């Protein structure tokens, strides 16, 4: 990789993508760029602010099943297809963290865990069994809560 310059010095976010690719968000040009496994640009979306009609400042980016999710706490979660085409906004602002699973988008909003169903557009609360945690994650019907000195694991039916 010596001598390779992808011009990503100012990139703010990156996430894994399908077929061993990755997405990068550049906050200076407000652009999304997807690279394939050979580090070739496959998709580029210029000026996201103009595209979505809002000034965005995403804090997290996740891809699942060829859908790209940009967590922007001011507006919600912007969703793009595998080509970078803007699809929709999940209008749930103030999320500190999102996790995208097959059965929904999970959002941690002001210490409350919400589940957004992209098929019914319904939002439901997931009651957390403890209040003292640093991070939360859902994997294979289990709820994981990270505390300072432990990881708590609970059965999850959501």
Tell me the role of every PLM-derived stretch.
Residues 36-40, 80-85, 117-121, 156-158:
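Short loop/turn segments that connect beta-strands within beta-propeller blades
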Residues 7-19, 52-65, 92-103, 130-141:
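Repeated scaffold domains used in trafficking and secretory/extracellular systems
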Residues 31-33, 78, 114, 152-153:
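WD40 beta-propeller blade core
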Residues 130-158:
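Blade-level signature of beta-propeller repeat domains, shared across WD40, Kelch, NHL, RCC1
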């Amino acid at each position: 990789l010596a001598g390779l310059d992808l011009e990503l010095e100012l990139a703010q976010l990156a996430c894994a993508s399908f077929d061993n690719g990755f997405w990068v968000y550049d906050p200076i040009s407000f652009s999304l760029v997807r690279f394939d496994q050979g580090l070739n640009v496959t998709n580029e979306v210029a000026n996201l602010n103009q595209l979505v009609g809002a000034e965005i400042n995403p804090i997290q980016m996740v891809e699942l099943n060829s859908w790209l999710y940009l967590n922007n706490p001011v507006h919600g979660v912007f969703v793009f297809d595998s080509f970078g085409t803007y699809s929709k906004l999940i209008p749930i602002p103030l999320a500190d963290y999102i996790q995208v699973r097959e059965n929904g988008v999970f959002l941690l909003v002001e210490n409350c865990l919400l589940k957004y169903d992209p098929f019914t557009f319904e939002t439901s609360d997931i009651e957390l069994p403890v209040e003292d945690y640093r991070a939360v994650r859902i994997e294979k019907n289990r709820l994981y809560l990270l505390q300072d000195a432990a990881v708590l694991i609970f059965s999850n039916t959501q």
